[in-house]
Amino acid sequence: MAINSESKANGALMRITPLAVASAYYSHEESIALAYKDAELTHPNITCQQANACYVLAIRHLIMQPGDSTGAIHAAQRYLEPFQSEVGAWLNDALNGNIPDATRMIGFVRHGFTRAFHHLATGSELRDALFHTLQAGGDTDTNACIVGGLLGAYWGIDEIASKSSSAPMLDRVINCDTSLGQTRPARYHAKKMIDHVSAFTVYR
């Protein structure tokens, strides 16, 4: 398979949430290395690797320190400190509300990354964050996936389930009938993920 090392597309960041959740079992350094390795599979550009690492470290922090959005952002900032990186500029943009037009350069990893950290910094409700991401246009499903992963880690499943604004969305995902439409193996059902996450009770 040919890999474009110049690509800064969003595919690696879109799929990194499960690894970010699992990183609660790994050290800080191991989590960064895994984030890099996963990006290298399809998106080896250093920008994609660094975006992955920021996102993984933020979710890792939120799992270990639930609700601490400030600490999650600081984890990403501390990781970026040694680098003169465009990802660092994106993170600053996110914190300052400078959100790029998602309909330009559709598929650019910057869009999902910036929106995810912006909504984390502002404490957006999950439903509102997803609504505004979808409303912005562009690569809507992928950007919403990226935003949803980080905001989901921030709010947590119990809080999401208790809110009238987000509970119906969660119910549709958890109780979806996978026998309808284009079927998927039962082992990939969302309920399986909940079982795995529930097992994360001890961290290094």
Regions from the PLM with identified roles:
Residues 146:
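Short phosphate-coordinating micro-motif centered on Lys-Gly-acidic
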Residues 157-204:
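Conserved glycine-rich phosphate/nucleotide-binding loop
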